[in-house]
C-alpha cells in the first residue's frame, strides 16, 4: 500500500510494505525483500522466517540505491520526517525514530533501534540488537558496537564519546 503524494523513482522494487503519505523513494531502491538471517547447522543453513513488513511513515525521503529489508518476526519501521541519503542498508527489524538524518553508505545490522532526532555521518556501521537513544549524533566512519544513551555524541571505531575521541586523536 502506497499513500498520497508519494513519488517512486526508476528501477525501484517494493514488496511487503506500507508506505504512508509524502514519501519519496529515489531510483534503484529495494524495499521489503527478505533479510539476511539464518540458523547455522553443521550440514546446512536454514533461513529465518521473514514475515514482517516495512512501514515507512509520513514525510520520508529514501536516497538512491538504498535497501530496507522486511522484518523477520516483527516489522522494520522508518519514522516520520526521516531522511536517508544514498546507498543505505537497513536490515530486518530495525526501527528508526522520527526526524532522523542518515548520511550515505550507513549500514544497520538487524534489530537495532534508533530514537528520535538522531544524526549519523556517512559510512558509519551500526551492529545488531543495539539501542541508540534520542538526540544522538554519530560521526562519519564510526563503528557502533554497543548501545548509546540519549543526548550522546560519539565517533570512532569502536564509537566512543566525541570529547574522548578528540583528546585521544590530537
Protein language model annotation of sequence segments:
Residues 166-170:
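Long, leucine- and charge-enriched amphipathic alpha-helices
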Amino acid at each position: 500500500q502506497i499513500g498520497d503524494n508519494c513519488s517512486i523513482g526508476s528501477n525501484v522494487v517494493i514488496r511487503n510494505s506500507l508506505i504512508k503519505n509524502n514519501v519519496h523513494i529515489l531510483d534503484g531502491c529495494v524495499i521489503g525483500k527478505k533479510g539476511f538471517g539464518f540458523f547455522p547447522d553443521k550440514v546446512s543453513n536454514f533461513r529465518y522466517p521473514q514475515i514482517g513488513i516495512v512501514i515507512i511513515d509520513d514525510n520520508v525521503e529514501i536516497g538512491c540505491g538504498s535497501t530496507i529489508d522486511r522484518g523477520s518476526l516483527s516489522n522494520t519501521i522508518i519514522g516520520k520526517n526521516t531522511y536517508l541519503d544514498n546507498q543505505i542498508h537497513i536490515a530486518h527489524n530495525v526501527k528508526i525514530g522520527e526526524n532522523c538524518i542518515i548520511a550515505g553508505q550507513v549500514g544497520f545490522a538487524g534489530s537495532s533501534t534508533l530514537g528520535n532526532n538522531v544524526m549519523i555521518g556517512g559510512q558509519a556501521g551500526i551492529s545488531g540488537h543495539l539501542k541508540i537513544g534520542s538526540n544522538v549524533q554519530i560521526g562519519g566512519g564510526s563503528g557502533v558496537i554497543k548501545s548509546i544513551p540519549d543526548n550522546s555524541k560519539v565517533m570512532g571505531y569502536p564509537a566512543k564519546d566525541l570529547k574522548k575521541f578528540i583528546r585521544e586523536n590530537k
